[in-house]
Amino acid sequence: MDATKGNIYSILNGNKQFLIPVYQRYYSWDIEQCKRLWNDIVDMQKKNKQGHFVGSIVNIAEQAMPTGVQKYMIIDGQQRMTTLTLLLIALRDYSIDHPKDTSINFLRIDNMLLKNEYENGDERYKLLLTENDRDILINLIERKPISENTVSRLLTNYSFFVEQIEKNELMPAEIYESIGKLQIVNITLDRAVDDAQAIFESLNSTGKELSESDLIRNYILMGLENNEQRYIYEHFWRPMELMFDYEKQGTIMDKFFRDYLTMKLIRIPKMDKVYEEFKLYHINCEFSSVADLCEDLLKYAKYYTDMVFVRNSNHEIKNLYADVKDLRMEVAFPFLLKVHNDCLEKVITEENLIEILKICISYVFRRSICDIPTNSLNKTFATLRNEIKQDDYMNSIKAFFVLRDDYKQFPNDDKFENAFCSRDIYNMRSRNYILSHLENYKNKAPIVIENYTIEHIMPQNTNLNDEWKKELGPNWKDVQKKYLHTIGNLTLTAYNSEMSDKPFIVKMEMEGGFKESALRLNSYLVKLTEWNENHIKERAKLLTDKAKQVWKYPMISEKELAPYCVEEKLVHKYSLDTYDFNVFTKTLFEVLDKRIMNLSSDVKREYKKLYIAYKVDTNFVDVVVQKQRLRISVNMKFTDIYDPKGICKDITGIGRWGNGDVEVFMDHTSDVDNVMEIIEQSYKQQEE
């Protein structure tokens, strides 16, 4: 490794070329990073500073040629070098366009910092980017026209620097001088000696932070020989990246890798640990080569992006993807990835895939209507693949959902009906989704919901006119309060502003009113001459019956379900009386128990033979009753606990009743706040 301190001029000077490897991300610095760089330049000049450190550029020297251009492969610092190159292009162009200003020589910039003057072809350029960025940068260097429709951060940032230079806050010569004061450490590695991957990971860049998917791409491709690297990139990695939306690519790909790992590992990696988890997976995975792994990633990326971007040649599946998107069902993706692959491999049919998508959508939607907390859904779907029986695929999935209880339950028709009739639908985020599906169910000419607005049949105005008060009866205030935003009182119209607070009969008979409406949602209304509580309830029942058809409960017979119903074993039932409490320890326990149970309605208490367990999916804390105190086992690694007060003990590898590597004691009721700070960390970890 050779590290030298210099500036962009010393780095670029000479017959050199800096190349960006195919695995590096596109140029991604935005205006904020450019503003920071420009402000540093202005600040140095105005305050007469001698220098300002802006970071490092790490490269690998390619095999040197006796003559010609010495080439360097950049492994870190692409963004910084590209941005400085854009600034130099803008400064050169200003000098060319303002010939009377002779304070700097544009040829010096052009021939020494942007081009290798006596070379031809690609070797003519000091910096060569990848893919689309490559052509755009070359066109900027050569001052060639670029299509007006071209969207690129290179152009945006170049234009920013042009605007700043033209403000004349600094003279061109001052800008050139300040650029030279930007200090850069240039680190050149020896491919035969230095571990480029390890060095890359250890760098603490001050630029735009690499995403987890950036790190994974570099990890996969950096260590390969050039030919294999290009093959993997062109045949697998680049096609995979093109499936993702460009502007949001990093974020969506990070989520893809997390969901891919969740599917493979059957546990959910933390978002900021995806890269580390992927490295461990790669070491232990079933694939014998990088190509096989990347081929698998490409396959699952296709399923993933089809769902995210609602793409499928099958119209019904495409509509179901739209439902998944509307309901924000990303938590189901790890399971759905597995199901899509089984469909591709003919384990299940396309009809089975459609049915599974519908079951998952109904599960999430019914729970939403019944206001069941969603924080356990990710773990429910992550582990669902374990429940699939290949020889009874569909029934095993249906049985899994039907047999859930408590916070994992699939609300049955009775629970769903009660909630759907009385729920405040209007203030739900999914209200348009609900109304459009009720309208379009089995409709050969579906409407576009965006062409309509939601209408309250009984108006929202708390000061109702006399006609409405008369129709609703003497308890009109109670009726309005109870039913205003419920499904029975909501419909769609293209004439919301015209209807306003008008009496029901006017809304019915007016131009564009309910009587003229072709919407199925309004078919019940056209038979009426008034609107009251009974009509609201009756219409709600009709719409709820339809909702039960749209979002169906899984159909499985008792015979099909029987193999999945495990008979309850005759086990000893424990209770509070099991434990050797005295008055003091009983008080300690009651104080702690109340605080733990108040964490969430999802928390369940279970009495075991030797301890009391508190769990969401698994135990997050266990309490053992001792003679004069409570011993508490917290289900976390000791290295992960935050314990500024030092009340925890490391019991890693030591046999104790309960779960986890952290032990804490509660000796007095006054200890409860400190103890809960530790317990809450374990609870939140399980929530993630």
Pin down the residues of each PLM region.
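Betabetaalpha-Me/HNH-type nuclease active-site subdomain
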Residues: 43-46, 51-70, 385-525, 529
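Secondary-structure capping and boundary motifs in well-ordered enzyme cores
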Residues: 67, 73-80, 176-179, 188-195, ...
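Short, conserved beta-strand/beta-arch hydrophobic-aromatic motifs that form part
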Residues: 606-662
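A cross-family structural signal marking well-folded subdomains
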Residues: 212-216, 221-432, 531
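Solvent-exposed, charged helical/coil patches
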Residues: 567-592
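Glycine- and hydrophobic-rich flexible loops that cap the catalytic core of alpha/beta enzyme folds
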Residues: 2-268, 511-518, 522-529, 533-536, ...
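Well-ordered alpha/beta subsegment
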Residues: 654-688
